[in-house]
Amino acid sequence: VGSPLNRNSKRLQTVRNSNDSRLDRSLGLDENITRRDFLNSTLLASAGLLLTAATPAQLLAQKAQTSAPDDFNGFGGIGDYANSNGNTASVLEAGHRIRDGEFENLPASIVETGETYDCVVVGGGISGLAAALIFQQLAGKSKACLVLDNHPIFGGEAKRNEFLVDGQRLMTHQGSAFFPVPYPHSFIARFYESIGLKAPRLEYQKWGGPGPEMKLSTTPYLGSAPNGTYFGAKFGKPEGMWLIGEETWERAPIPAKTRDELMKFESASNSEAHSPRYPGDAISRRLDSITLEDYMMERSGISRETIRAFLSPGEGAGYGLGPDALSGYTAYAADMLHPLDISDETGQQMFPDGNGGIARLITKTLIPESIAGEHSLDDVCRKPVNFGALDRAGAAVRIRLDSTAVWVKHEGDPAKSDFVTIAYTHGGKTYRVKARSVVMAGGSWTTRHIVRDLPADLVEAYSQFCRAPCMMANVAVRNWRFLYKMGISGCQWYEGLGNYTQVRKLAMCGAHAPTIGPDSPTVLTVKVVYPYPGHPTEQQGHMGRAELLSTSFRDYERQIREQFSAMFASSGFNAARDIAGIILNRWGHAYLSPAPGFFFGKNGKPAPGDALRAAPFGRIAFANTDLSGVADHRSSIIEADRAVGQLLDQVLSG
């Protein structure tokens, strides 16, 4: 029968479960809408597993035994990308087999394809696609190139999510977002023109009302469009408090000392005395020797506690972690590498699916039949992918999807070898191809494992590439009148999941409707990063990944619905009625997080990016945006161009 204590515990648990069920229903978790096509969800991993520091692979194995098939991936949307929302469980499992040493030796059952290519590109993100295109442009179509991509569709983090909401097809980005208008005579401008992006300033939706026009951003980032700041229970405001307009900190429910520090920090300017004049000068090298947090404290007198409470991860979100984990040079690295206008007024441009539009344009240029229709922005954005055209025998360039490279090694001495062996998994089997040259355009976290004869100095270089996870949660809402009623189109907050969201008007090349207004359906993106201030940079990445991978779709969905309800219910928002769908894009290694010493080296050794860029290793050259230290698709393209040039000049020229 059990003790009275146990009976009471069971009764309390029954009441709690009943209350939870009622709350879930009020939030819309059991509504039959497009957010998911399954009913049962359980947590991916138990608290006990987390406390024993389980690896991501163990967490996924636990999930496979105890959870519904979609408990991790959740609803993936509609269209070509429906089964490729972020790193899906199958992509993660394939990658973790590499990390866990399953391919230290190739299996006896390996399938010999008999294929030999002039160039194999490992990685089908923007860097890999750009490498294939540049190889084709420079080497000619008589040379054969194969791109191996581990996802169900090309693009890497430059992919889209699509929803169908009240008859309107909505499109948004999974990761890589905007592109600045390039200098007209720059390499990037010439590259854009070569893929059909000849007029990089896009046309956007117009205001359609009803009601007075509200300024809207063209990107998902807070800028000059009207926005507000929310303070909730964490700040002694259980009913919520909104501050809209100027002088937010002056009115915020925070201690006077904190208020003064934040106001002083915001008013501080980057004087020339603080700013590097060129990469590698004395100022930039000193900044690279300290953390961004130390630099912020030194420059404006702000305390460590205030930085971590209000400016983390905001000041480091472009690198995935907070200022305590990053090199001080990250304050300037992007502007020094790409000194362009990125204002939301004139500089930032964005396809409806973010830089997925760039990836699609490159692919259409490589393989004209890959996307239906003409080579126009409108058709490339709107028309479906012809998957059958991607990997056709005899084509100059082939893109092989769902193919995870697990082994890259020279045949014999790298200095004398004529070929590189590449093994990859696909459909439960392992296959082998040969190449006269290889571009490693995937992420540093896989390249370091799969290049089997990588020399010690490059192994050491790759050990300095720390990566942080990110989740892009895309929330489709039937309208955004709840924001319009408050006089805002975006907002930020300092508690809960993520820290900002923004309504944006879409570029016309992919927008369903020519106008937008408060009654229009839209997608609100919530970017979630996982800083653990005070821990070493690499450890923060591991801790963040454990959190990202151990949380079920349903649990994240509940958090999003609760948070939106807390913030917006007072202006008429109803989660069960107004949320039409949620897609989670989990990126386990989304951002390079450069620790001090990454950009210019330390202890007399070169910067890791410089070591990998200097020359090919045998017949292998290295690309990917990682090497630049700046997560930017332009860096991906520039690194691809350098890698292909090295191979053509130093490896394939004989």
What spans do the regions from the language model cover?
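N-terminal secretory signal peptides
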Residues: 1-37, 62-63
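Active-site/ligand-binding neighborhood in enzyme catalytic cores
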Residues: 267-403, 414-417
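Conserved flavin/dinucleotide-binding core of flavoenzymes
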Residues: 65-108, 162, 476, 482-654
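Glycine-rich active-site loop/strand segments that organize a redox cofactor
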Residues: 74-79, 155-186, 322, 328-341
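Glycine-rich FAD pyrophosphate-binding loop
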Residues: 136-161
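Beta1/beta-strand and adjacent pyrophosphate-binding region of the FAD-binding site
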Residues: 113-125
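Rossmann-like flavin
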Residues: 194-333
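Mid-domain catalytic core of redox enzymes
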Residues: 397, 401-525, 529-534
